[in-house]
Amino acid sequence: QSFGFEMITVPMTPTGPDMDLVEQLVKDPAVKGMWCVPKYSNPDGIIYSDETVHRIANMKPAAKDFMLMWDNAYCVHEFDGDFVPFEDILTLCREAGNPDMVFEFASTSKITFPGAGISVMACSEANQAYMQKLMGIQMISYDKVNELRHVLYLKDKETTLALMKKHAQVLAP
């Protein structure tokens, strides 16, 4: 809102955002984007269904500069049970003819240390070229020592998921 955006609240269903409403809203060229937390979405912990993810990827927004911000903040946060995989939004958007519509984000800040984690962004090659221009003037270098700490500590998917189980033991009532 600080940037002049009017935020539109879309009700959640057990399978994700109300896609009938979303599909109506994106017909308006004034609607410029959508922010999604597809896994364990706050406050209810909803995981978007495959059908919902497919519908999002296949949207045809009226705004040519529409951006889908895919905030994968909780991608490995299985405290109970097994890892819950879900559809790859980048591939689905590309297959739907929307390769430049989506930016996917994640970080380790809710895994290792809040505010000191490392972040990742995934997007199309065209969006990557654009973002590299923007980021190139904003930073001299990444914190390579912190990146190394994370690589050595987290190692791989299995180690990371095991760490999340340890977090669950601490956080459980």
Over which residues does each language-model region extend?
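Surface-exposed cleft-lining segments at the edges of enzyme active sites
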Residues: 8-9, 41-44, 162-167
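Structural motif
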Residues: 32-37, 69, 120-122
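Hydrophobic residues in well-ordered beta-strands that form the structural core
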Residues: 9, 68-70, 150
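Conserved core segment of the aminotransferase class I/II
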Residues: 91-172
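PLP-dependent aspartate aminotransferase-fold enzymes
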Residues: 1-37, 54
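Active-site pre-lysine segment of PLP-dependent enzymes
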Residues: 19-29, 41, 46-68, 72-114
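Active-site proximal loops enriched in glycine and acidic residues that flank catalytic Cys/His/Asp
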Residues: 11, 38, 72, 106, ...
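Short glycine/proline-rich turn/loop motifs
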Residues: 35-41, 158-159
